[in-house]
């Protein structure tokens, strides 16, 4: 408010306290207003106004001006008053104006220029489309592509600021609209895409080296960073050279400088912002894999403790790099960066009270307004008081302003609600919770790993005191000959145990009944076992220490079976992770059986070389496979085709009559029955999916063969759970309440037995592998001829097997290869029975080369669960690159089946060639009859 005294010599002064102003002064209201977004609309004609530039002033003694909400122009346009904070209409007007400007430029441009710019825009949009398409192929639908664009946009903003503000160069919008499409099309995003591909590929490969996300990212930057730096520096040099060469063309020179700065800042944003996004993507992938592995292992029937132990081993624990060690330089850099960031924001926040520039501007504006309207305000006899209202804006009533009004009304409602004393506190609390959750998610991989390790440590037993611990003697250097003596005792009683006299058996039994088995010494626990008071199988549970349980069981069985060999080191048991064995792989454990492991290869399978591990005690088996691999590689390697994937389980059910059994068979064979059973079965697992039901009737017995995909697990436990539930639904929901389940497995599967149903319909993975061997390789490597090899294969593998009435045994030694690979890779060795079903075909091509193929309809393998959770077997799966679950469920198991078929092919080729050349006996005498050492 402003006051002017009655004298003409006085001036207008600002008034804060009305008590200093006479009561009977004349009072006027000054209301400034503007008409915005007029466009083609006419403004209302008003009388008694003062106009200054775009601002109009209404001077009135009444409050009518304050009540103005709506004005009508001569053309009927309705203008509504509002605070000019909404900008939807403004942006729409800007868009329309920009479109009109572009349209005018197009009309005035030459045809060639229009075509050139159009091609540039097409190339730019294609580059953007290619960015998202390639990122999608990498494994990100939207976010990595969007993050790449944001990274480049930040580089553009930084470069634009430096160019226009620091270098004071003019970059017209027209130059940007014409130059940016060419720039994007030429530079592209190839280096960033390659970086993302390298990062995600390194993570897949890192499962063998267990690197964490920072290490994986660091390795990718080391590999891809120099290429990014080389390309960007080359283009920066080119743009700067162009700016010097075309210095007389200001527009081109300025844009070239801008482009060079964009590339320079792009290096910075790629190595900071985009790298951070990639690191987050890595950790999210790690969490996804851990969750997927946990669910598959639990579906496969493993205990929670075993699952946690496997997850700990398979987590990206991380190898040491410079990022792991505490670095003073890195810490100082981080603190300095954060300090500068907050300092700049604090300075910006405090600039108003540091310089007070805004106050000066406001004062100048106020007196400018006073000078413009002072002549229109009469001075009263007792002075005049003027109230200056905020500027009021009038906008034409059109669609954009109506939408804007609705949006502003909604925002205003939210703003009012947010200021409520209760709602504001709730929002603050929700913000705190949200921030905490986001911090948790950003560190979720490390938190996940840490908590997993802590949980495993809690579940593992505490270390015992010296008197109850497994006694391990100090290492003693002995001669090689001494290590084979049966009298060598690996574990003798500890000093504390020997010094302490054993308590009477009755006292030991009382301590056992009181639950104090852990406090007993080893010999006392052995006495409980030999007395029949403590079962052998309960040692792990009672002692809470798996390793100690194994040691005591060895001593107990040594006494019970009078087998002192168990007190020697002939059957080792130390240095083994029994936590994975207990509840998953074996019971009543007394040690582990070392097997020699050889490697055959490299064998090229579908264009990729593999070194295939084989655990065997048969001499010349690995050598035979190696010879086959060499011959196959000379022909270009193995080509494989997977024709079917489905594990089976065949329960047997019984009905009161043949009629009811037949009705159930018809229902199961119908589309309705298949669909109902699929719904019931699929509800039991995320991974098991029922493919088909096959039925067979024998009297009133009905055999149902469930064929199911089971992801990367071999799937017997997973599918059994689904079968039990589906049969339960049949009796309780589907109307077959008179059905009785005879057995969940009715041998119609068929598991671990030779059966025509597996040979005909397949079980597990059905794979066909083929290779073409040059005739020169047959002669030089296999030491035979194509004709002789083909002849032996027909007479032996086909006619000979037919004469024997074989089912699926039309091969030379498929079981040899399958079993050796299964033992090395943690597969079920008993399933070599059906997995070894194979027919080997060999023919001579028109060129005289040898074509070999093996067809194996029932390879039963998995890359999670079972023996694959053990570290030695798991490490061999890592050697093949198929350990654990794949990103595409089931892909690792399918690839493993192809590897098995391929090594069988090499073994078949080598053995048949040896038979054709008459070398079989000679090779076995050389490799399998080595003289025993004395």
Curated annotation (Swiss-Prot):
Molecular function (Gene Ontology), one example: hydroxymethylglutaryl-CoA reductase (NADPH) activity
Residue numbers annotated as active site: 618, 752, 828, 924
Database matches in CDD domains: HMG-CoA_reductase_classI
Segments on the Cytoplasmic side according to the record's topology features: 133-141, 190-231, 278-334, 443-934
Transmembrane regions listed in the UniProt entry: 112-132, 142-162, 169-189, 232-252, 257-277, 335-355, 422-442
PROSITE patterns, per the entry: HMG_COA_REDUCTASE_1, HMG_COA_REDUCTASE_2, HMG_COA_REDUCTASE_3, HMG_COA_REDUCTASE_4, SSD
Ranges facing Lumenal side: 1-111, 163-168, 253-256, 356-421
Positions of disulphide bridges: none
GO annotation terms (biological process): coenzyme A metabolic process; ergosterol biosynthetic process; isoprenoid biosynthetic process
Enzyme class: oxidoreductase
Sites carrying sugar chains: 361, 364, 382
Entry binding sites for NADP(+): 685-687, 712-720, 928-929
Highest taxon above the source species: Eukaryota
Subcellular location(s) per record: Endoplasmic reticulum membrane
Pfam families to which the protein is assigned, alphabetical: HMG-CoA_red, Sterol-sensing
Record's keyword annotation contains rRNA-binding: no
Reactions that this protein is recorded to catalyse: (R)-mevalonate + 2 NADP(+) + CoA = (3S)-3-hydroxy-3-methylglutaryl-CoA + 2 NADPH + 2 H(+)
Any coiled-coil regions, as ranges: none
Family, similarity comment: Belongs to the HMG-CoA reductase family.
Record protein name field: 3-hydroxy-3-methylglutaryl-coenzyme A reductase
Species, as recorded: Cyberlindnera jadinii
